[in-house]
Amino acid sequence: MNYTKVYNNLIKKGKLRKLDKSKLNFYTEKHHIIPSCIGGNDDSDNLVLLTAREHFIAHWLLAKIHYNSPGLIYAWWSFYNFGEDSLGRNLKLTSRGYQLVREKFSKIHSNTMKEMWKSNEYREKRSITLSLPEIRAKISESQLEAQNKPEVKEKISKGVKAAFKRPGVKEKHSAAVKKSLNNFEAKKKQSNSSKIRQRTGKHWQDYDLLYKLWIKLNRPKRGSFGTYISKLGYPKSNYHRLIVQFNEDYERSNNENCS
């Protein structure tokens, strides 16, 4: 098919109507003969009135003629998704037509986004936008809403089950979980050590020594332990926080030995 010839004939037909809609007794839409995305202007000689069906066909032909124009492919895609005929009915789309426009639109959209992400300015603006509390809240709300839908849950479940059936996936997941848990425990230890270092007092300075003594005495309660170490020159106190820390370290040590 000679798409250019068909397009020109369609435009000639539309030109006969002029541009005054009030003189027509049927629905029409204004169409740029040379679309603005490829250099067209808004002058009257570049405009024509087409019926909804003709307008749809015109953009289909333009997408065929200018196959690598992102703007025209997007316009074509928009007609397929949002177009209506003169009676307000959604424009029907064949499976072949849908596949063609979807694949082309997807490819062009992907290339466009790749080019945009190469721009430092775009990445910076995107980062600022996504960091806004109201935007983050909307994204989170949208994701939670989507994940709570039964069909989405089922799809996720099937995807996870299928993934675990692939060779090596289960082993990799297990290793990642163990690594994550080890990192968590290491950070927790570091955090506790930091807290201990930040505390003042002779009993905190001698923490390791007193912890070993507490273990040797069969982990006495704070009153008994306080009385014992006061005889060693430490101030009289109930040592509540010290014993709490001892118990946390003791439990953690036992858990590590059992794992």
Swiss-Prot record:
Q: Alphabetically list the UniProt keywords.
A: Endonuclease, Hydrolase, Nuclease
Any one GO molecular-function label of the UniProt entry? endonuclease activity
Where does the source fall among the domains of life? Viruses
Question: Transmembrane among the record's keywords?
Answer: no
Q: Which family does it belong to?
A: To phage T4 mobB and mobC.
State the protein's name.
Probable mobile endonuclease D
- The record lists the organism as Enterobacteria phage T4
